[in-house]
Amino acid sequence: MTTYQTLFLIPLAISTLVTAWLPETDKTITSRNGTNLFASSKGKIRGVNMGSQFVFEPWIAEKAWSSMGCKGQKSEFDCVVSLGQDAANKAFAQHWGSWITQDDITEIQSYTLNTIRVPIGYWMKEDLVNKTSEHFPQGGFAYLEKLCGWASDAGLYIILDLHGAPGAQTPHNPFTGQYASTAGFYNDYQFGRALEFLEWITTKVHQSDSFRNVGMLEIVNEPLQNAQKVGSMRSTYYPDAFKRIRAAEQKLNVSKSGYLHIQMMDKLWGSGDPEEYLTDKYYVAYDDHRYLKWDPKVNVSKENYISTSCSDELDSNTPTIVGEWSLSVPDDVASTPDWDMDTNKDFYKKWFAAQITAYEKQRGWVFWTWKTQLGGYRWSYKDAVAAGVVPEDIDSALNMGVCN
């Protein structure tokens, strides 16, 4: 397939390889009913994360976590140990089949969104898991394929994100799939396992029609924010990931215009310059996560939050997608009258508009996350729309002129 080719989403022969791209740059896509979700955004990414679908973060959905029998467990690893493998497999299968459904994808499409980012863990390639020392749910890949099929039919662009890396890329955080005491990812053994995963998922993406709208693969989410400690990641893992992904694509005779975009956290993230050791930057992309609530340099006031967001220039590397952000504020003020969600909707509307205005100076944005069980909208796009804070027509937020 050639650059700028138009792809209509029709059934493909099983032997046909599926290609990757950036929407409206490399090709145009439409849903099965003929809708081009990128037409209104002029090619900008506007998306939501599928948080807790395949890498469960208990804080997002404590009720669902408890119903699985995982109450009190810190991570997927811990829950599988507690339940036992067979019981855990059944519990997680029920979760995978109910947390994000085809109805969710239809609703996402209806809100003028055009992209989903799907966090996944290396344990989805089950033969990578050391059965004596590592414990993760089994059977997730079939549900990933089903989800991506729904999204492709809807005309949504898909980013797959290695959220949980072997050994854990950061300690004490369930988004790695395990509540590890130390970050064990940064060595040749764990890099090797991650590379095997990247080869495998790349091959799966190009071989299945369900993955036809997967155009980007993030090779590790949120590594340590310490450039010195992760030097080997930049010098070894990043270049090797490019080589292994491209080799897998070449083995399948994928044309260069059909390659996956390979995504890394940008320089602003704090893990050093991702380009430092790269010799091949073809179809490279970058990710930035912007949470003002955790930025100690930002004074906490509503006026400052809006002005800071309006002035954000997240262009340390290009093209950059702001792959995580929210409407959440520091915990010590979140419940105070000045920041109350019910009485300050006008502020949250403006702050949403300010953030997307800034992020669309770059390639676009993906909100964290689509849905939660937190009882509010600051972390939940679905609930923010229901509350009237986020409009169904995203352009109407941009047209508010908050940053003018």
Swiss-Prot record:
Q: Which Pfam families match?
A: Cellulase (PF00150)
A cellular component annotation (GO) from this entry: cell surface
Q: Which residues form the active site?
A: E222, E324
Alphabetized, the UniProt keywords read:
Carbohydrate metabolism, Cell wall biogenesis/degradation, Glycoprotein, Glycosidase, Hydrolase, Polysaccharide degradation, Secreted, Signal
Q: What is its main location?
A: secreted
Molecular function, one GO term? glucan exo-1,3-beta-glucosidase activity
Q: State the source organism's domain of life.
A: Eukaryota
User: Where in the cell is the protein located?
Assistant: Secreted
Keyword Protease among UniProt keywords: no
* Sugar attachment sites: N33, N130, N253, N299
Range of residues in the leader sequence: 1-20
Q: Which cysteines are joined by disulfide bonds?
A: none
Under InterPro entries, the record lists: Glyco_hydro_5, Glycoside_hydrolase_SF, Glycosyl_hydrolase_5
Indicate whether Glycosyltransferase appears among the record's keywords: no
Which GO BP terms apply?
cell wall organization; glucan catabolic process
Q: What class of enzyme is it?
A: hydrolase
Its catalytic activity? Random hydrolysis of (1->6)-linkages in (1->6)-beta-D-glucans
Under the heading Gene3D superfamilies, the entry gives: Glycosidases
What's the Enzyme Commission number for this chain? Answer: 3.2.1.75
Record's function text: Beta-glucanases participate in the metabolism of beta-glucan, the main structural component of the cell wall. Acts on lutean, pustulan and 1,6-oligo-beta-D-glucosides.
Record-linked PANTHER family: GLUCAN ENDO-1,6-BETA-GLUCOSIDASE B (PTHR31297:SF39)
The family note in this entry says: Belongs to the glycosyl hydrolase 5 (cellulase A) family.
Name-wise, this protein is: Probable glucan endo-1,6-beta-glucosidase B
Which gene specifies this protein's sequence? exgB
